[in-house]
């Protein structure tokens, strides 16, 4: 008798995982605590409820990484994309949906599937046996959070998410910036040049502080707390404590020499640190912020060297429950210490509806394949889905791991293409062409049981 797959959480990831597994011929029990146990953000007990925006972002599958993710999920027969297409609204090049019709359709479709049973009620522990996928999202209940923390170690589960902006390396002006660790610390050349530095003189620093203090800020949402951990103070809060605070904190200029102007000591320095193994993404160190997105881009582009910066992710601080996935999950999305349990969706450290659904798609297929005795590896990191799972299962730096949207900085480079802004269109088209080919190969590579 074929084993039943249990999936906890009926959001984007859990709904997609249930659909994919059931379509592969596996019986699924989908556990959803709503409406019996609610959250401060959800309004209904529907599956696939969109609690924030109603946008799935860009639908451009040639020049945009999230649009490519749309394409991959459609090619895999994804439920979330099918329902989004069915209920899409006019939104230019973006994919926006009627959130109520979308969630109702997801619920109705899953309820009608002969292999899916939906059980309403809270799951508050990690079962010792059976195949399970936990896709409980950033609003995981306190009881289940405690159970996950007990299994993974308390430090592995974050409850307050401090996010610094991430910049594409090829958009940084290296005629103004340079690579150097403070005091040239490190045993290897790579360690001694681990940070990217952007210098400021006194006038530039004062103008930056003025812009920071004047920028529009996002207010905390209902259910969030305004108490900060000292280790993740927003930069604007630090600036409010004194105009020199940042210059003696994350922007201190000590231990650094600007090779472009070796005789001029910077008044302040903004440091960026590599955020992925490919070296295509750099995060701005200590720059977690509650500034609104438009204000962030304007303020951060006043930093010398970042005038033309392109951002893979803007900063923010909000409550978020997520695993330190690079240390805890394998490429099959299994908990290394409990391989009968997989995680999917935002709790794995991806950010966004589409990314969450994509991780649900992958977890559902991988779990179903294991149950059916089918050999199925994770997709190549040249695909959007594969790039995400590679990032969260080890490609990201575990010590600085934070939730991530899909972006081309996660993809391995295509050889022989021009770098920089001028070559971007051809480069992105090469990424998406390669991804589509490799994704189709992955979809066709499922082997029958021996």
Curated annotation (Swiss-Prot):
It catalyses: uridine(54) in tRNA + (6R)-5,10-methylene-5,6,7,8-tetrahydrofolate + NADH + H(+) = 5-methyluridine(54) in tRNA + (6S)-5,6,7,8-tetrahydrofolate + NAD(+); uridine(54) in tRNA + (6R)-5,10-methylene-5,6,7,8-tetrahydrofolate + NADPH + H(+) = 5-methyluridine(54) in tRNA + (6S)-5,6,7,8-tetrahydrofolate + NADP(+). SUPFAM superfamilies: FAD/NAD(P)-binding domain. GO terms for molecular function: flavin adenine dinucleotide binding; tRNA (uracil(54)-C5)-methyltransferase activity, 5,10-methylenetetrahydrofolate-dependent. Its cofactor is FAD. GO terms for biological process: tRNA methylation; tRNA wobble uridine modification. It is found in: Cytoplasm. Its EC number is 2.1.1.74. Catalyzes the folate-dependent formation of 5-methyl-uridine at position 54 (M-5-U54) in all tRNAs. FAD binds at residues 9-14. It comes from the Bacteria. Keywords: Cytoplasm, FAD, Flavoprotein, Methyltransferase, NAD, NADP, Transferase, tRNA processing. One of its GO terms (cellular component) is cytosol. Belongs to the MnmG family. TrmFO subfamily. Transmembrane segments: none annotated. This is Methylenetetrahydrofolate--tRNA-(uracil-5-)-methyltransferase TrmFO. It comes from Roseobacter denitrificans (strain ATCC 33942 / OCh 114) (Erythrobacter sp. (strain OCh 114)).
């Amino acid at each position: 008798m074929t084993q039943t797959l249990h999936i906890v959480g009926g959001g984007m990831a859990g709904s997609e995982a249930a659909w994919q597994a059931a379509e592969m011929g596996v019986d699924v029990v989908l556990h959803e605590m709503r409406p019996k146990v609610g959250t401060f953000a959800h309004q209904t007990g529907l599956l696939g409820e969109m609690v924030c925006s109603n946008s799935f972002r860009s639908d451009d599958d040639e020049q945009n990484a999230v649009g490519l993710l749309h394409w991959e999920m459609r090619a895999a027969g994804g439920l979330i994309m099918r329902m989004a297409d069915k209920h899409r609204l006019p939104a230019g090049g973006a994919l926006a949906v009627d959130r109520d019709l979308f969630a109702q359709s997801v619920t109705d479709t899953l309820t009608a599937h002969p292999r899916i049973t939906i059980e309403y009620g809270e799951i508050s522990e990690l079962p010792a046996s059976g195949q399970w996928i936990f896709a409980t999202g950033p609003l995981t209940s306190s009881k289940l959070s405690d159970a996950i923390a007990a299994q993974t170690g308390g430090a592995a589960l974050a409850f307050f998410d401090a996010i610094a902006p991430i910049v594409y390396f090829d958009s940084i002006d290296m005629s103004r910036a340079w690579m150097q660790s403070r005091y040239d610390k490190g045993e290897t050349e790579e360690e001694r040049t681990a940070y990217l530095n952007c210098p400021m003189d006194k006038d530039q620093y004062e103008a930056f502080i003025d812009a920071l203090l004047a920028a529009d800020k996002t207010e905390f949402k209902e259910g969030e707390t305004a108490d900060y951990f000292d280790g993740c103070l927003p930069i604007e809060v630090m600036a409010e404590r004194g105009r020199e605070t940042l210059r003696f904190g994350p922007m201190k200029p000590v231990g650094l020499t600007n090779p472009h102007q070796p005789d001029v000591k910077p008044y302040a320095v903004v440091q960026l640190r590599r955020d992925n193994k490919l070296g295509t993404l750099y995060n701005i160190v200590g720059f977690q912020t509650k500034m609104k997105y438009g204000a962030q881009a304007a303020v951060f582009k006043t930093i010398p060297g970042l005038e033309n910066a392109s951002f893979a992710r803007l900063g923010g601080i909000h409550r978020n429950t997520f695993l330190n996935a690079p240390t805890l999950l394998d490429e099959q999305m299994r908990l290394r210490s409990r391989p009968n349990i997989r995680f999917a969706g935002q709790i794995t450290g991806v950010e966004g509806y589409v990314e969450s659904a994509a991780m649900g798609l992958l977890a559902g297929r991988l779990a179903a394949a294991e149950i059916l005795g089918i050999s199925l590896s994770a997709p190549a990191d040249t695909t959007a889905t594969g790039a995400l799972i590679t990032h969260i299962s080890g490609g990201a730096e575990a010590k600085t791991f934070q939730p991530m949207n899909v972006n081309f900085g996660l993809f391995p480079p295509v050889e022989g293409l021009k770098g920089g802004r001028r070559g971007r269109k051809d480069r992105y088209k090469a990424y998406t062409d390669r991804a589509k080919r490799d994704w189709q190969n992955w979809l066709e590579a499922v082997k029958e049981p021996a």
